[in-house]
Amino acid sequence: MDKKMFCYQCEQTVGCTGCTGNAGVCGKKAATAKLQDELTGALIGLARAVDGAETISKSTSQVIIEGLFTTVTNVSFDDAAIENMIQKVRAEKERLVPDCNKCQSPCGKSDEYDMQQLWNADEDIRSLKSLILFGIRGMAAYAYHANVLNYEDAEVNRFFCEALFKIGYEESMETLLPTVLKVGEINLKCMALLDKANTETYGTPEPTAVTLTVEKGPFIVVTGHDLKDLQLLLEQTEGKGINIYTHGEMLPAHAYPLLKKFSHLKGNFGTAWQNQQKEFDHLPAPILYTTNCLMPPKSSYADRVFTTEVVAFPGAVHIDEKKDFTPVIEKALELGGYKEDQTRTGINGGTKVTTGFGHAAILSHADTVVEAVKSGAIRHFFLVAGCDGAKPGRNYYTEFVKQTPSDSIVLTLACGKFRFNDLDLGEIGGLPRLMDMGQCNDAYGAIQVAVALADAFGCSVNELPLSFVLSWYEQKAVCILLTLLHLGIKNIRLGLSLPAFLSPNILNYLVENYGIAPITTPEEDIKALMNH
């Protein structure tokens, strides 16, 4: 492909075909996209160097996970940071195979991979390898967060190498398809690992009402997904007269007992990631980005953007691994916050939201739920979940939830919930009809609930009165979708648009074997799903 860049990994890619110009829709420059390709090629070279090894060292695994996470949409816009990551990958390979560069008869077995080979491959091969690549990029984010809390899984670590190796190897459709589904299988283990890490570190999430009001005085907004960063910031700001507000996917942090004990963790600011340039405009407070989703900041708040971990933006102050948040704290005190309390609302006018309905909380009411289904009080369950985004038409999910029947339960997770999480849908048998299960990785919890219900009724998950209505934007949504396919979940509705990296043949395979379908209208989809 003779283009300035090529990237089609997110839902908003140009024309649902790919970003090829001077910059992507996400805001990354063509040079940045090329560096991401170079980084991916270097990671494949590292995977080639460890091919056949019985064990993967902790340092190698950490480099691979960090490198993959760096290439996720809206994580790093900083060319220097990506170049440093490339050098880190090459240094790790040099440590493993130090004699390769000196070899007089190079075999090429540990060479870096030229990503142009992938982008110019047969469209079906390209499609399957893209599913693998984007899936392990998303999975790397979950592995990274688990690693931060000192949890890891040797099988997960080995699979990153296995998958990268296959991307750089000549494979047929027949041999790639099982690997695509294996991404889903291993991601289930990875999400289980992160669920264990979060709950054993911070406690089991509890249903918790969260205010959207911002109190007067200095405050800090924390966005992203990393609970450890939030914990450290809460500890460092305690007693300093600074309030902390979550943003986006950090909202579920309010449900964890260890984090709830901090009285200055006050509430949630704003809605989903794509609204940040409007919501952060002239914000009298700093914003700490712990992971994606970062958008190029406007000049009105660029001086108060702080990044950490793999997140990076040129000119933004980066908090290194020492985790000294003093610059963020000083900026909060300097800006001073609002002069008076600010009453803010969600998209639908609600002044509070509720989170914390993880699998443990829901399954503690399993008998009530089962009895409600048997009595007819609950006729259907909908999992309306996934990423939010800026493309027009995502109000579909708001309208869908509003129109769900009064005898149905809506489970949700990830940032797509901000389209409707401030709605009051009422209750059934003392349980709220709308239950927020947490971050995108808490799809693991939704799966646990589905499996438990299937066991209770002696049927398969596909035989339950349960429908999956998903929204996607970036690569974590890809690995979750592959997990659902690995589990044999059928008749998933997916939107807002279908992935550009699905070739017609691969899409047809998913339709024929799994019943995947694009969303249409809320009315038509609810009718079809209720009658399925």
Regions found by a protein language model. Give the residues of each.
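Electropositive, gly/pro-rich neighborhoods at or near active sites that engage anionic ligands
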Residues: 43-201
